[in-house]
Amino acid sequence: MKILHLSDDGLPDWRVEKSALTAKKSGHEVFFGGRLNNNAKSTIFSEIHRINWTAGAMVGIPYYYHRVKRQIEKLVKQLVPDIIHSHNIGSAKISQDLGLPAVFDDHEYFGMLSRVNAENINLQDTRNLKSGFDRIKQNMKVSFISRQSISNWTNWEKELILSVPTITVSEQIANELREVADGKTKEIIVVPNFPLETEISFKEPQAHGHLSSVYAGGDSKYKQVTNRDISGLTNLFADNDIGNLTIIGWENAESSEKYKATGFLTRDKMFSEMIQNSIGLIPWKKHWSHPFLNPNKAYEYAHAGLFVMLTSDLRSVASTLEDNCLTFEDYDDLASKLEYFRSNTDELYGRRLKIFNFARKNLFWEKHEQKIMDAYKLI
């Protein structure tokens, strides 16, 4: 069987590649269509093909949308896939328009994402535009794209979950989608974004002589992201006796005595850096979208033997980790709890061992991957 994975993003994309690897292990041939850059490569896909997505196409502006639709139609005629695995809402909608056998991978919960994107667009800085007229034009443009995204993505998502098998990353999202569709969804399958078992065969974590925390994420440095806001985090460590902080993904120009940044790391180097720490943080300031987010960094932390601390409204993560994590309300609360662990290192080490063993038994991709093959059978 031929399976074509479509995305409005490029490679590497570990969620897309894990899904493809699942099918490939079962003897199927997998292909990729999406944005390609100079670093686009994969040993998983038989072929990778360029699809020129634009912002207009992604939000359904007819001229741009139909240009991408023609590209996908041409690619489908060339490859003749048995199944389309759509990793973005635009390609899922186009697959539906073309009458193709498709699965919709709604791992972003696109109706929610459209509203978050609208918030972020409204925060864009237009101070560098040359004139007031330029600012007006820019504001009109982003306002139009924002409205299109919210309207189309919300409507498309409802159409898709009523008509095609849908994969998502948490029970919270699945339940919300069922409620949106009044319980009339086709089939909604939960496949959490856990690491592959083959990449997490780590030894039992070792005790550390000092307290150190890590945050993995290149987001939120050069632009405001309303639901991943970590502003003030580095100052929190600089101003308090709560150990050191490493941020994986940020460039290291601002490193100091209590804080360092690693820049981008490959996955193996990322895990090697994580292991040097004791606590994995998800320190996003509270946001209405958080109950529906299920970031995979929490589970990477767990496999690296890090005790996970996260904002209390990230309920999907807290539910998955059960009692193997600790939530906080704000940065003052986070600082207080880090101070406690600085003075109670034996307790912290015990918690690290506990979450490490919990992860080895429960938090790996292969435990759920058969659900993807089951979704294909529903088409």
Positions of PLM-derived features:
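Conserved catalytic-core segment of nucleotide-activated headgroup transferases in glycan assembly
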Residues: 16-17, 21, 194-257, 263-271
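N-terminal subdomain of nucleotide-sugar transferases
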Residues: 1-40, 231-241
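A short, charged, and often flexible helix/loop element on the N-terminal side
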Residues: 46-73, 136-145, 261
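Nucleotide-sugar-dependent
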Residues: 14, 221-227, 268, 272-273, ...
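Membrane-proximal helix-turn-helix segments that form the acceptor-binding/catalytic region
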Residues: 70-74, 93, 104, 110-112, ...
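Donor nucleotide-sugar binding/catalytic pocket of nucleotide-sugar-dependent glycosyltransferases
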Residues: 138-201
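A charged, aromatic-enriched C-terminal amphipathic alpha-helix characteristic of glycosyltransferases
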Residues: 329, 343-377
